[in-house]
Amino acid sequence: MARTTPIERYRNIGIVAHVDAGKTTTTERVLFYTGLSHKIGEVHDGAATTDWMVQEQERGITITSAAVTTFWRGMDAQFTEHRINIIDTPGHVDFTIEVERSLRVLDGAVVVFCGSSGVEPQSETVWRQADKYRVPRMVFVNKMDRAGANFDRVVDQIRTRLGATCVPIQMNIGAEEEFKGVIDLIKMKAINWSEEDQGMTFSYEEIPAHLAAKAAEMHEYLVEAAAEASEELMDKYLETGNLSELEIKQALRQRTIDNEIVLATCGSAFKNKGVQAVLDAVVDYLPAPIDVPAIKGIDEHDAEVERPSDDNAPFAALAFKIATDPFVGTLTFIRVYSGVLQSGSGVYNSVKEKRERVGRIVQMHANDRTELKEVRAGDIAAAIGLKDVTTGDTLCDNDHRVILERMEFPEPVITIAVEPRSQADQDKMAIALQKLAAEDPSFRVETDEDSAQTLISGMGELHLDIIVDRMRREFGVECNVGKPQVSYRETIRSTVEVEGKFVRQSGGRGQFGHVWLRLEPLEEGAGYEFVNEVVGGVIPREYIPAVDKGIQEQMKNGVLASFPVLDVKVTLFDGSYHDVDSNEMAFKIAGSMGFKKGALLANPSLLEPCMKVEVTTPADYMGDVVGDLNRRRGLIDGMDDGIGGVKLIHAVVPLAEMFGYATDLRSATQGRASYSMEFLKYSDAPQNIAKAIIESRS
């Protein structure tokens, strides 16, 4: 089966933005104008096509990135048909993982800003993520009909706060309630969209007289930006003072793809103005799969290889999202980088080193699907029937194995205990958690050995709220949720020698176990070491493992506050036994008693987990952020300058002091700072804190 759309007419783009910039509404308009949906779905009605989870329709925010395929011939039908694969992504800080994994598989992005609130904190986070993956992007300044909307101010913020060279290719005609349309700064014409047919038709008109001078000035800036693409263009521009429309477009396209400039458009998706012009700009300026560098990977001999966007190259794809569908089971969203994959054929998962079979391949339109016979280089689709694939795995041709660049996922930062409300919920909960963890790499599940509770960890409180909500709705599991917890540890600080003796002799067969142990502290992270120095058979060899086992059991239960003991070396150097009464159980108990007695004499200490915290904040709030970290017993490790005038603060802070930090940081910096944290080490807890914890658990 031949390719229906040539690869140079593909655009794989993401629509990314801050919460509430109007991103999902923009996507809805795109689907309406490209003919995919006949009725526009509004977010505030809970009817948006791409928000298909119940939680999203209730909360009015986008949680998972839905992939949608659509076609576009241009506002004026000026193009041959182009195929646009769009990924709509969430803008909430707890879901940055979704944005990250979408950007990883896209070739370009449309970043939506609100015309009145401009560059917001989450926009800074998203922008940095796009910088990390070098994604070419353009800007749509939306909500120009809103009170306080100001296109020039937003363009200025993009330049100063995000450090981008922003080049407007449109300017607005009026703003707020007076917003009428836009001026195309390349054609130098005004565009008015009809209000009778939801903006389906439009007309080109002359630029209003009062805006002519400003439009001429902005046109000049745009032509200069285009001329900088090459020496030839610059020479022509200096000689003639102008460039042709085609030359301008080709030059701006090249500079956008090279990440040198960011083009800006404006409009109001809700008022049906400007969205088709965004689609035209996507086709004109954002890259096709063949315009971006070929993806790199590692072959089975650990050599670096490339996979070009070519149907004739060996098949290679990246699984970038797993979703559970109520009708077909597990959907694995894949981005095909090279080659062709037919439904029903076999693939090799090079990360898991397993062969898999693809049952069916479907093209997703938010929540609906069309069956496909095959997918080719540049396609984004969902595969059904893959058994053991997780986000970030590479699927490839068995004869040409490759592992594509892995995605890096942040460590979860918050943990809560969940308990099923009834026995019936117990089994369902295990299945639900396993499925949810397969879908979301930033969500973890484990069992606490001390309390046997199920612990779930994620990227924030909203993240875990939604997980618990999904367990209830999708899997029918009712559960109780505990408070966030910290996991402490214990260790010793000095060396002791101690006797452990267990004797029971009351007529008949007794119990006798007798050991001498030396306990020594080890360096941080060294774990547990057991050494047998018994000579001359004072303890028979078959009882030695029982002593070790008894010590390890006592270590798990701790000696101060029932937390596990870390970093200890125990040497068994003497002891005695009884011909009749000694057995394994007696020596196990003797080992356990000896360790407990010795650890209490060896200057025991309570350890608390300390986190490596990195805060990104605008310079204005640096003093407040540092002061707050100091109040949380944080040690400031250093500070750096980030892109776009932000400061990076590196600190080490005890986990116990970090609960509620996301909320506090948001309010202290008006939501403009973001942070990440990961586990660093266990350190001695201060005496007053250790004392309170030990008393609360005794």
Swiss-Prot record:
SMART domains: EFG_C (SM00838), EFG_IV (SM00889). The lineage of its organism: Bacteria, Pseudomonadati, Pseudomonadota, Gammaproteobacteria, Alteromonadales. Disulfide bonds: none annotated. Catalyzes the GTP-dependent ribosomal translocation step during translation elongation. During this step, the ribosome changes from the pre-translocational (PRE) to the post-translocational (POST) state as the newly formed A-site-bound peptidyl-tRNA and P-site-bound deacylated tRNA move to the P and E sites, respectively. Catalyzes the coordinated movement of the two tRNA molecules, the mRNA and conformational changes in the ribosome. GO terms for biological process: ribosome disassembly. One of its GO terms (molecular function) is translation elongation factor activity. GO terms for cellular component: cytoplasm. PANTHER family: RIBOSOME-RELEASING FACTOR 2, MITOCHONDRIAL (PTHR43261:SF1), TRANSLATION ELONGATION FACTOR G-RELATED (PTHR43261). This is Elongation factor G 1. Transmembrane segments: none annotated. Its main location: cytoplasm. Residues 8-290 form the tr-type G domain. GTP binds at residues 17-24, 88-92, 142-145. Belongs to the TRAFAC class translation factor GTPase superfamily. Classic translation factor GTPase family. EF-G/EF-2 subfamily. Signal peptide: none annotated. Keywords: Cytoplasm, Elongation factor, GTP-binding, Nucleotide-binding, Protein biosynthesis. It is found in: Cytoplasm.
